[in-house]
Amino acid sequence: MILRPRQEESVTKCIDALNTKGNTLLVAATGYGKTVVTSDIIGKMKSDKTLVIQHRDELTNQNLGTFNKINPSIPTSIVNGDNKDYSGNAIFTMAQTMSREKNLWNLPPIDLCVIDEAHHAASDSYLKIIEHARTLNPKMKVFGVTATPNRGDGKTLGTIWNNCADQVHIGELIMSG
């Protein structure tokens, strides 16, 4: 897969922010290709262990498939109701699955935690995973991607992310064709 120039720009901005500022958020409109951008970022970060968290099973499989197309040489694994495989350099899971005590205690130290649909991250299940993973590696970075950074319940994402590396609005996508 070849990224578009604007996607390459997002990748560069996000990697720079992760390396210099720590926890980083990418806000991009629906249709931008956030999964492709995120997969490229993970591949270029070259972390020993990355945990990729989704909120739905369909997204777990979709994100895993896209990741494997972009990064065919990076070993992946999945932790879900049927599989408990933590061996991959990139581990894909749902928040509801990983937040269970039995699954959390098997989690290896993570260097990069990626949260798809990051507006969900202020919920208890996500915070439980982040807090546990941070006890295993206090230097773990958290990268989030979302089209909608605002939550209806008023909880802020600022407790997790201290900066937003890039924002891509729908108007920009329309103008670029």
Segments (PLM) and residue ranges:
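Conserved helix-turn-beta segment of the N-terminal RecA-like "Helicase ATP-binding" lobe
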Residues: 50, 58-82
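Hydrophobic residues on the short alpha-helix immediately C-terminal to a glycine-rich phosphate/catalytic loop
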Residues: 14, 37-45, 63, 129
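Loop/turn-to-beta-strand initiation segments
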Residues: 49, 88-90, 110-112, 137-143
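Post-DEXD/H (motif II) to motif III coupling segment of the RecA-like Helicase ATP-binding lobe
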Residues: 119-176
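Conserved Walker B
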Residues: 95, 117-119
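Conserved pre-motif I regulatory segment
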Residues: 1-27
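Conserved helix/coil segment N-terminal to the catalytic DExD/H
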Residues: 81-112, 127-128
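Walker A/P-loop
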Residues: 20-42
